[in-house]
Amino acid sequence: MPQLVLASTSSYRRALLEKLQLPFITDAPETDETPHAGESTEALVQRLASAKAQALAGRYPQHLIIGSDQVCVIDGKITGKPLQYSTAVKQLQQASGQCVTFYTGLTLLNTANNSINCTCETFDVYFRTLSQAEIDGYLLREQPWNCAGSFKSEGLGITLFERLAGRDPNTLIGLPLIALTQMLIEQGVNPLTVKPVE
């Protein structure tokens, strides 16, 4: 089996990939994440996921490299990680009572034969109408400063939602495992037939 490389230092993506019980390493890609003029959200996340995988290709010439990138769209605008309390408050105020869409680009690059597979998975989060006290209470408890959209769905963030809609809930956390599994199987790596990590 070719060695898997996760082109990310995200602890969230690492934890998701561990669910597949395959051996892998992580490495930090250096990529310019500036959107191109007129670029659609889907094209942006696919381009960045691909760029992250390709940024590591020279270091890993006989590997399967996984690249992923995610953006959150609130009210038609791309929203990033809040990084601070005041920005998180604004993001949750904007999301209150709205549908927020997450776009996650996924790339699997086989550097042994130079084949590449890219896709974009979307996931919709329907927020309850939130009071300012709820927003403040949530942010003080969970402090999701490094999470697009200012919440952690795998934690207390679930209390902010009315409903969720999408093919794979892992997409919301940053790595679509259903799509990734399909890509891996196409490359001859089936998580159910490979010896699991001890």
Swiss-Prot record:
Keywords (alphabetical) are: Cytoplasm, Hydrolase, Nucleotide metabolism
- Which reaction(s) are listed as its catalytic activity? N(7)-methyl-GTP + H2O = N(7)-methyl-GMP + diphosphate + H(+)
A GO molecular function annotation here is: nucleoside triphosphate diphosphatase activity
This enzyme's EC code(s): 3.6.1.-
Q: Where in the cell is it found?
A: Cytoplasm
Gene Ontology biological-process annotations: nucleotide metabolic process
Grouped into one coarse class, the protein's main location is cytoplasm
Catalytic positions are 69 (proton acceptor)
Q: Which Pfam families match?
A: Maf
Enumerate the cofactors the protein uses. Answer: a divalent metal cation
> Would you identify the family this protein belongs to, as annotated?
Belongs to the Maf family. YceF subfamily.
This protein is called what?
7-methyl-GTP pyrophosphatase
